[in-house]
């Protein structure tokens, strides 16, 4: 592992001075390589799915693990989208001239070496790699045992693309073992080789990384996302948004887990809940909702802090916007919250009083995604307040330097 870290640092030094044209050529070569090796990639994924069935992996994890032609095409498209993004490296963030004539520029620079530790999503192999490459960073990937075959097949295509573009193959390295001790070594930083760790996976993985890492991390513990339906909301809009936010893909961190309804308008929005039930969604709710919809289960205290990642939704009535804010402040993981309302005064209160990384108005929580933000892809969602927050794209994978130009000035 130490040798891998040293190779990554050497590759990072080379990538830092690569031109935009060189990096974009490599991204196109990677896209072509993924297309050429698509059959092998899908076959490797099939083996992972067979193993998942034998290991009784839950539905949400299997959904994250699964690749098909459509998802693979989406991954390939994201590679080309990232290639089309502006190169962040070398961008002048701001500049000014001091009274003594010194001209100061704040310029974006790569972070260096990024370690990515992830579990069942094979797409992370590509998303993380291409974002690191575009931003001039080397990557060390450690995929989970569930996606082992898929991740290695995808990595093979990545290395082929790098080689054909003339870039160092050590720019994107993958740990070739399932040994969990490797994670501990990465969290220690590989003797200073790793600059940042990004975990992508379940609560246990992220909690371990947050507890044990000796290097900075970009992470979120869980996606406990909320939607508040205000009495001013449009019924059809509320129905469409909640159905999408819960059921489009239940196993992603942007799926809504709790819906809060203005108590004054509960009967108006009952069709939202019946529509969910018709789609097979289990609802766990407060007593006033159970009274009106007897086939709804009574929610327990644990339901308000539960990330289901399944077709299950907790629903609660609240005393207007103040009640919604109080609930979200108590239970939110700081990921994503949405308000459905036409009253802009209420919307303003929602946006001003909540501190989650992403706040939405009249839109599904499933838009909490770097691709949907125009970032091409994302390496993860960060809920911390230092450096990166929200979807982590190419700009968030850079630091900055101050470039100071003088004309012989000395300090008095």
UniProtKB/Swiss-Prot annotation:
GO terms for biological process: L-proline biosynthetic process. The keyword Amino-acid biosynthesis applies. Pfam families: Aldedh (PF00171). The keyword Cell membrane does not apply. GO terms for molecular function: glutamate-5-semialdehyde dehydrogenase activity; NADP binding. InterPro entries: Ald_DH/histidinol_DH, Ald_DH_C, Ald_DH_N, Aldehyde_DH_dom, G-glutamylP_reductase_CS, Glu-5-SA_DH, GPR_dom. CDD domains: ALDH_F18-19_ProA-GPR (cd07079). Belongs to the gamma-glutamyl phosphate reductase family. This is Gamma-glutamyl phosphate reductase. The gene is proA.
């Amino acid at each position: 592992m130490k040798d891998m870290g040293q190779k990554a640092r050497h590759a990072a030094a080379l990538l830092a001075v690569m031109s935009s044209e060189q990096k974009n050529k490599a991204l196109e070569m990677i896209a072509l390589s993924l297309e050429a090796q698509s059959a092998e990639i899908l076959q490797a994924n099939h083996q992972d799915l067979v193993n998942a069935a034998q290991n009784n992996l839950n539905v949400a994890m299997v959904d994250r693990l699964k690749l098909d032609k459509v998802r693979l095409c989406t991954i390939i498209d994201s590679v080309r989208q990232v290639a089309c993004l502006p190169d962040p490296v070398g961008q002048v963030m701001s500049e000014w001239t001091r009274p003594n004539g010194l001209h100061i520029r704040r310029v974006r620079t790569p972070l260096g070496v990024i370690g990515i530790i992830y579990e069942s999503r094979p797409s992370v192999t590509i998303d993380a790699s291409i974002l690191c490459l575009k931003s001039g960073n080397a990557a060390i990937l450690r995929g989970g045992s569930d996606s082992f075959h898929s991740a290695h097949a995808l990595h093979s295509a990545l290395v082929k693309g790098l080689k054909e573009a003339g870039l160092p193959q050590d720019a994107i390295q993958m740990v070739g073992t399932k040994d969990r001790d490797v994670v501990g070594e990465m969290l220690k930083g590989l003797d200073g080789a790793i600059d940042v760790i990004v975990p992508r996976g379940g609560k246990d993985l992220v909690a371990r990384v947050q507890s044990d890492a000796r290097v900075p991390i970009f992470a979120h513990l869980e996606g406990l996302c909320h939607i508040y339906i205000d009495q001013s909301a449009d019924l059809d809009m509320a129905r469409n948004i909640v159905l999408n936010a819960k059921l489009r893909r239940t196993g992603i961190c942007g799926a809504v887990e709790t819906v809060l309804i203005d108590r004054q308008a509960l009967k108006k929005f009952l069709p939202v809940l019946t529509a969910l039930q018709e789609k097979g969604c289990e609802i766990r709710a407060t007593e006033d909702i159970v009274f009106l919809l007897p086939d709804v289960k009574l929610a327990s205290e644990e339901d308000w802090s539960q990330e289901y990642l399944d077709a299950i939704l907790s629903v609660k009535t609240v005393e207007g916007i103040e009640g919604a804010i109080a609930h979200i402040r108590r239970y939110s993981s700081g990921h994503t919250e949405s308000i459905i309302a036409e009253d802009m005064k209420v919307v303003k209160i929602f946006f001003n009083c909540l501190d989650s990384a992403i706040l939405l108005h009249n839109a599904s929580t499933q838009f909490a995604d770097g691709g949907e933000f125009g970032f091409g892809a994302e390496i993860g969602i960060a809920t911390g307040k230092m450096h990166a927050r929200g979807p982590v794209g190419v700009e968030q994978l850079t630091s900055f330097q101050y470039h100071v130009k003088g004309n012989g000035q000395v300090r008095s």
